């Protein structure tokens, strides 16, 4: 498993950047006029992603960075605290509440600030000081921990991911999945691949 993880895991800094991109893309689906059930799904998807991201940084990445830039690491812990507070506040509200949109936008402001700070200061420092090998090792640790954190929420994550897409996108995705399944089934038949390549 370690050998396979080391081949498929991104470096720690790449993984963090990917998490940032995922959070921003998820939040981009949130609009004031979005139906309440979709707003809730977007927020829950974002909340889980941010929770996993924060745990990975706090348990693995920040301890490795503490000796390099302890003040910046402490600032990031504080930003995580603010994100967690806003997520809990959102979970206590209904999407139809006026405060829901305001709180969601405040969460996004904190996330954007956090992303900007990490990607312009902390991550470049990590790449410069820790080096490629250590970042790869941290990436493997973070991948292993991510799998542990996400596994209990796989069903919830899948349902909320589908709910966050507009109906047309979900329909197209469904049709593509069915098409992929049918193609795979055809290709696994003894004559399937030969018929396609003949």
Q: How would you name each of these model-derived features?
A:
Residues 1-198:
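Small-residue-biased structural context
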């Amino acid at each position: 498993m370690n050998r396979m993880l080391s081949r498929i895991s991104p470096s720690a800094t790449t993984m963090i950047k990917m998490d940032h991109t995922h959070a921003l893309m998820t939040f981009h689906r949130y609009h004031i006029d979005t139906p309440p059930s979709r707003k809730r799904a977007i927020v829950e998807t974002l909340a889980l992603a941010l929770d996993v991201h924060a745990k990975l940084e706090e348990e693995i990445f920040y301890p490795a960075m503490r000796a390099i830039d302890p003040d910046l690491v402490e600032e990031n812990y504080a930003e995580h605290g603010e994100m967690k507070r806003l997520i809990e506040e959102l979970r206590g509200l209904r999407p139809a509440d006026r405060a829901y949109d305001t709180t969601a936008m405040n969460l996004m402001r904190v996330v954007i600030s956090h992303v900007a700070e990490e990607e312009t200061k902390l991550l470049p420092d990590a790449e410069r000081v820790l080096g490629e090998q250590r970042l790869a090792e941290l990436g493997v640790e973070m991948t292993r921990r991510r799998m542990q954190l996400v596994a209990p929420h796989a069903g919830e994550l899948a349902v909320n991911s589908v709910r966050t897409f507009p109906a047309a996108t979900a329909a197209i995705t469904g049709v593509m999945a069915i098409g992929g399944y049918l193609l795979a089934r055809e290709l696994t038949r003894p004559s399937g691949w030969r018929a396609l390549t003949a």
